[in-house]
Swiss-Prot record:
It comes from Capsella bursa-pastoris (Shepherd's purse). This is NAD(P)H-quinone oxidoreductase subunit I, chloroplastic. It is an enzyme of class 7 (translocase). Binds 2 [4Fe-4S] clusters per subunit. The keyword Nucleotide-binding does not apply.
Length: 172
């Protein structure tokens, strides 16, 4: 008789514990009902990136002095810098500069250590392609500035969404 009573007591304790856990989960669910959704419809809505976002690298050919600091600080020796020594003026002349974004880890060391600030990070992050060789950008492709998300009229940004117009600013 005694084992049967202790079995019923254990069953009752386990039932109360399960009800408490279900109640805790339900309270968390109820606390989330007043929050606005964070999800965006990606191709049609885009988040505005932060100032420190590390996207595609922008390169200014005229500022580069071919010092190769970017290659030395890169953890994977990624930037390819081709130059020629001009003997009459004793300076390097940059011939070609390229970065393969299929390999780049976007650490930002090249931008940080560049002495002439010819490299900068942009807010562009869409690199989708069917051929990985198209991710190898030369100095011409690196020199193009991306279209800003704010200026893109085809995309409804978070700033124009109805939630932010009502005075609620969920993400910024």
């Amino acid at each position: 008789m005694l084992p049967m009573i202790t079995g019923f007591m254990n069953y009752g304790q386990q039932t109360l514990r399960a009800a408490r856990y279900i109640g805790q989960g339900f309270m968390i669910t109820l606390s989330h009902t007043n929050r606005l959704p964070v999800t965006i419809q990606y191709p049609y809505e885009k988040l505005i990136t932060s100032e420190r976002f590390r996207g595609r690298i922008h390169f200014e050919f005229d500022k580069c002095i071919a010092c190769e600091v970017c290659v030395r600080v890169c953890p994977i020796d990624l930037p390819v810098v081709d130059w020629k020594l001009e003997t009459n003026i004793r300076k390097k002349r940059l011939l070609n500069y390229s970065i393969d974004f299929g390999i780049c880890i976007f650490c930002g060391n090249c931008v940080e250590y560049c002495p002439t600030n010819c490299l900068s990070m942009t807010e562009e992050y869409e690199f989708s392609t069917y051929d990985r060789h198209e991710l190898n950008y030369n100095q011409i492709a690196l020199g193009r500035l991306p279209m800003s998300v704010i200026d893109d009229y085809t995309v409804r940004t978070i700033l124009n969404s109805p939630q932010t117009k009502n005075g609620v600013n969920p993400l910024i």
